[in-house]
UniProtKB/Swiss-Prot annotation:
Organism annotation: Danio rerio (Zebrafish)
Xref: SUPFAM superfamilies: Fibronectin type III (SSF49265), Immunoglobulin (SSF48726)
Record protein name field: Contactin-5
Region feature (Disordered): 1-33, 711-736
Domain Fibronectin type-III: 629-727, 732-829, 834-928, 933-1023
Amino acid sequence: MKADSSSSSSMSSRMRLRNSHGVGSSSQDWSPFSRHRYSALSSQEDYRSEESEEFGPVFIQEPDDAIFSLDSDDKKIIMNCEARGNPVPTYSWLINGTNVDTEADFRYSLIDGNLIIHNASEVIDYGRYQCRAENSIGIVLSRDALLQFAYLGPFSGKTRGAVSVREGQGVVLMCAPPSHSPEIIYSWVFNELPSFVAEDSRRFISQETGNLYIPKVQPSDVGSYVCQVKNTVTNARVLSPPTPLTLKTDGVMGEYEPKIEAHFPQTVLAAKGVTVRLECFALGNPVPTITWRKMSGNIPKKARLRKSQAVLEIPNIQLEDSGSYECKAENTRGGTAFRGHLQVYTLPQWISMINDTQLDSGEQLRWECRATGKPRPTYRWLRNGEPLSTQSRVEMVNGELTIHRLQQADSGMYQCIAENKYGAIYSSAELKILASAPMFNNNPVRLIATVGKDVSLECRPRASPKPRISWRKNDRRLQPSRRIMLLRNNTLRIINSSRSDEGSYVCRAENQFGSAELTTVLLVKEPMRVELSPLRVEVTVGESVVLSCKVTHDPSLDVSFLWLLNNQPLNTQQDGGHFEYIQTQSSTADLMIRSILLKHAGKYGCRAQTSTDSVLAEAELLVRGPPGPPGVVIVEEITASTATLSWSHGVDNHSPITTYNVQARSPVSLGWQTVKTDPDPVTGSMESAMAVDLNPWVEYEFRVVATNSIGTGDPSPPSRAVRTKEAVPSVAPANVRGGNGRRHELVISWEPVSEEYQNGEGFGYIVAFRVNGTRGWKEKMVTSADSTTYKYRDETFPPLTPFEVRVGVYNNKGDGPFSEVVTVFSAEGEPREPPSEVQAFAVSSSEIKVLWKPPSPGLGRPQGYEVSFWKDVEQEELGKKKRTLGNETNMLLSGLDGNTQYLVSVKGFNSAGQGPSSTAVKISTKKNAPSLPPGNLMWIQEGNNVSLSWDPVKARDNESEVIGYKVLLRQEGRGHSQVMRTPNSAVVLTLPEGGTYIIEVRAVSEGGEGAASAQVRVLTSSGVRAKNGQLSVQNSPPGLAWTALFLSLMVPSFPL
């Protein structure tokens, strides 16, 4: 929208987007006179700041295009429409431009703005619908929505004749679809469902005509064909009558050139953004091949070929995809082509829309709306839903509306419509013509100023048209001067005010509708003075200080204080309680700073404020503390053991730096370590030093820490990592030793030298050894820096031969030192004799105890023993082995099968290998424990004594005989159980304390324990205990007579 130059300021300030708010800004003009006649509306928020303010209808929801299925059980259609406005809008509807009479036609009803259509009929209700929203401000029309009806009629029941062709000839089977709406999808059934025709280079189904094309018929094509159509909305399907396809018997069709039978239209219209599918298929023998090209330019890269190249598919079509496309069909007999034009259109889209506007009567309105589209849109204008016609005051040119000399009757709702042949879009706005007498909201006004300061007296009446403004003081008309100015916005500006400016100022506003006055009483007070002490103070970290702020001001005014640090408000509630605000009198305010930190240094401000004045006084706080971090460390030069470093001074925090400490870190060090320097010490005036006694070929980082009389500060950022130069190794391996190994081996081991002391690349070890009493050394190179062992084998070595051994180091720079000479013995031999007196005893059905004696002392002493055991019916290789942890001479074998004979042998072993096995001994495990649990548990309780009995358990033939019973007792909620043994099938228990106890019984045999009985739960009296706090047991005689009380038992299931 544009505005004439004569009124652009007023118009732009009062034009508002209906869906968003714009905020304007203005700059002051210090000219003493102003001719500006309008009061500006700052934003739409001002315009509609209250719910009570009236405004025209604004659509929240407009009707959308809809497709209704005639097969739907619910014959009701709802077209939605909703608008906001004040007063609340009322609604009506148009169908194809004609009003819908909801009172005369019972099929139509309105719920709020929604139109309900009952018993919908395609004949009556098909068309374009518009919603009309109306209130006292005006009328707006929605976009139009197309209502269509989806249906699919039946095929004609007429029998279709057979199609007879020669083999090799082409054929087109016609679908002749029934009436339908909207689009349908075609497919063909061959002979019977669900056998559908598969499309390939020899079969094509056109989605434009529905016909089936077969360029070269083969015997396998003979059969019955049925066309199936499917509605894309309702998913309804119908089948055509069958069309038989037969072969003639008068010969085979020869080759013939292609003939295009299915192709896209010569002109294809497509909306921007949709997917376009161009069809092209030909008959011919041999079967033709299809190729595509774009006549001007290349086919879009996004395009895809479908159905054996018979369909060119272009997704998300754009304007640049327009043009002529050609499909070509070729075979060995010739070729043919078809060419058509693809034209892409776009619906109108807004570039600029119209906005709500309010203007004074007599002014000029100029609205402009602009839209893009292909074809280019044309424009129409509506006022209150009716076409706006050109008059002497009204001009409409290319989307621009101009109304001269606005009148109150021009108020209302306006709509700009941009449309082309494919669609239309609407932009709505309200035009409000203002006409009111001046009015002031607040009257009178009391204003207080300070001597020597400027003061502004505002005059902002609400009026339309803009009123004329005049000022007077104490009933005398004010004349502008160098010190008193009337600004363009009607504000009275007084420069350098004094007590003589006090008085009553009256602003008078008047227009043709009336007048109003605003009285402002101006009082001028003496300025305020603020003293802050001390103005500059130095403290040390950890100390405290108090800043005192005193103010002198007019006693009739209240004063408030605000403390600032470096021009930012100070929050005394934060920062760990370092700040405390203290005010003992209305004119003083103190700030206490406790346990001062370096970050508390800076400029502190005390701002005193009254309703007329604001004064700031500032003081500087200097904090002495440890130095700040030095600048980043730079490595100037590096050698094998030194590094020359430089850095820059950090802040000294008001206490001179006395010394620097140089630190280094390497991948093998424990964090940062202080290093020796030259010079030593490094004084605070220096910015370089040499780190000495570094290890060669180690990657170091360096940093520097400064110290002053207050303390040590934070370290500098670390230097880049640098590696010292290589040097000959200087550290020999430690803890050289040896021994063990296999027969005829000499095993030498050592602790590896850490990377920190390898001093260069190519690090390795030199292992030197000789038999005691000989002169020459044998030397072997070990090239791995991580190696810890070297083995030397010589068949001539007797076991335990003593050797003198030493281990040295080397790297690419040369050989380093050797370790001290130590004596190392060669390996002894594997055991020569087997263990003797091997015995085995059955412990239970699953355990065997094995005992033996070690072989006679001598070379090849065992370091441990290996026991092998296997079933008598198995081979030894299938058995198991188990080793002792040391030189034990017994072992318990468990996890064995019951009542089974095993063979057991023992052999010794040491680091040299295994010795011979002993002779195998045979041993049988005991029979399995009884599988049946004790049954028929009965009990009698007298106090804390419980008499318990059960039926004896009888062992089966393959089970061990019962030799007694084990009674297990535990208190509920505890894991520990007490165990009692008895040879009888009855016991008397004295329970140790009150509570609930769980009792179960197991049979005991040589084969182990049997299955558990059902659990018995017994509740004893609280507080009753046995004398010694332990469970006491009395065995009952076998013939004891029982009077039994059965409990609720927890009975597990057992196999019989």
